[in-house]
């Protein structure tokens, strides 16, 4: 069986492709820069290994890439900001220079190219494909438009707009057309291509069976979610202006969202006859793919990100944002890892409280009555060290890795689902302490709640990391 390398495995398509490759018996290595995120979302498997890889590191790339028969290139640079084209092409160059005699096939997931016009995102995809084909290994480029599935950036942007905006004013591109493809259908093509070893490079366009305007896509998402849709289109609102709302309305990373929006002013209609004849399958209708995506969004809670916690899964509700809002604070310290962890894991104890602004923490507990909660209940772990399942007041420990990581499930009432994370990292000559809050808002009220709480969060978390570090240093002196 082929040895398979998945580059960009922590991304949307890559993370969902991994279990399918394993089911078919491949020996898979998943590589990503965001290796901690990948580990948290991936279940262990005998045929799966996880590797940290930054393709910008040419030496590391050349050490890893040559050992595989098949390579999925699922990398993009949209999260890097305005200069991502040069960044993305540099990654592709490093990858091509690392290809060796053992490599037989590269599968590159790209974007459809419109007949007229383009954007930086589309240009980057096009130029990356051209660069990959200059290498010594046959490349299959799969050009896809909008992918519909839980976690797809384009889908989640539309879904968040429907759930979070009482009134939607859209650019004229809302009447552009596309034939979105279901994630399930895309995976079928990827898995079939994995079985082939072509002698020369090839390119396929892939799309779904229905050509739908973005206006009608919004309408069906709203209908499926049982939400009202009040949408007006105007030429005064450009995709560039609309992109500035992304950080407020949706939790999809803003740089990725802006890159996608810039390309949506074009029609994206795939001509997929060739690949449909070569790898036949029943294509899922647009209506069905939206229904499947919305109804299965909560499944991602069943992952190590949430400690496979049953309480978190039970509390998930339709309408919660797939991607979370996040805020936090960090500090770099000379204190030891052990001392920082020893102090941090005392969170909520009678001695420490929450390290800083305890009155604000207690005030929020009593405000829970306004959200339909009960009178605050004081709860503490039985033992001297924390373990999964322990209760700290209204919080529940859902993950605990000694001297590294602590995750607490938010137990109070609120329009969303949240968790608090404390991370301690050793960087050799220094340590980093990070405290972050993650919030999956439920609709417009969930967003209002998040932004109303953000000033307090920033104030409290900055004070917390300083207080923990101070105590850790004092402990080292004793």
Language model features with spans:
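N-terminal Rossmann NAD(P)H-binding glycine-rich loop of SDR-like oxidoreductase domains
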Residues: 4-24
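NAD(P)H-binding glycine-rich loop region in Rossmannoid oxidoreductase-like domains
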Residues: 36, 42-100, 112-115
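Glycine-/Pro-rich loop/turn segments that contact NAD(P) or position catalytic residues
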Residues: 77-163
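Substrate-positioning beta->alpha
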Residues: 153-154, 173-194, 202
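Mid/C-terminal beta-alpha module of Rossmann-like enzyme folds, strongest
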Residues: 193-256, 267-329, 336
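A conserved amphipathic terminal alpha-helix motif
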Residues: 287, 446-478
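Glycine-rich portal/gate segments that line the openings of hydrophobic small-molecule binding cavities
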Residues: 333-341, 345-415
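Beta-strand/loop substructures that line and gate deep hydrophobic ligand-binding cavities in soluble
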Residues: 410-458
